[in-house]
Design a protein with these regions (language model features):
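Conserved S-adenosyl-L-methionine
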Residues: 1-78, 83-85, 94, 102, ...
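A conserved structural/catalytic subdomain of Rossmann-like adenosyl-cofactor enzymes
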Residues: 64-217
Length: 217
């Protein structure tokens, strides 16, 4: 939704006064997948309430062979489920080749690499364990992103940003799919505040690093 709102605010004349580009925005640009049918309905309704006439919102187990998408997307924005595990038998074999694991947070990163076009970018929220985990699977997915793709930024977020639902520490990874590496200088930012209190109430507060992150990146 925010990506669509950004395009409306900043690219309105370029997109919405061109028939072909407008059709792409309305009918082909935005894709979403979930295994919760209620969330699918909410997601589709939310997109339509924000000018997208026909969002492609589909029931799909993204980590299984049900998902054939490869080299398809130019941008992936994701907050995938983590702190969970799956039966390896239902996970797509090509993802397990990247990192053999049951941990969803690692498998989704492998999936995003596969789904991106070369030159496509991903901004993904991950638990801190992805950055510091010592298992072979953790090391394998970090190697994939750092050595085979181009890692551009790591934005560390305080542990309260997802309260009251979760208190885990998280970070945003931003990377570009290259297929041949290219990681050089990685931009790090330690976010201290996001404009809301870091307790269960999540009340508005003055401190907010988000605009500084946008301006500095």
């Amino acid at each position: 939704v925010e990506a669509g709102e950004y395009l409306w605010a900043n690219k309105k004349d370029e997109i919405f006064y061109d028939k072909q580009k407008k059709d792409h925005f309305m009918n082909h640009m935005f894709h979403g997948y979930d295994m919760d049918r209620t969330m699918l309905r909410i997601g589709a309704m939310n997109m339509m309430n924000h000018r997208v006439e026909s969002p492609f919102i589909e029931y799909r187990d993204s980590l299984s062979d049900q998902n054939p998408d490869k080299d398809k997307y130019s941008l992936i924005l994701a907050n995938p489920p983590f702190k969970g595990s799956l039966d390896a038998d239902i996970v797509s074999a090509d993802l397990l080749k990247v990192c053999k694991t049951k941990k969803t947070e690692l498998l989704f990163l492998a999936l995003f690499v596969r789904m991106l076009k070369v030159g496509g970018r991903c901004a993904c929220i991950v638990p801190d364990g992805v950055l510091f985990g010592s298992s072979k699977a953790h090391k394998d997915i970090r190697k994939e992103i750092v050595e085979n793709q181009r890692l551009e930024a790591v934005i560390s977020m305080p542990s309260g940003v997802f309260k009251p639902y979760a208190g885990v520490s998280t970070a945003i990874l931003i990377f570009t799919k290259t297929g041949h590496g290219g990681t050089d200088k990685v931009w790090f930012y330690d976010m201290k505040a996001d404009g809301r209190s870091l307790d269960d109430k999540r009340s508005e507060v003055k401190e907010n690093d988000i605009q500084d992150i946008i301006a500095s990146f």
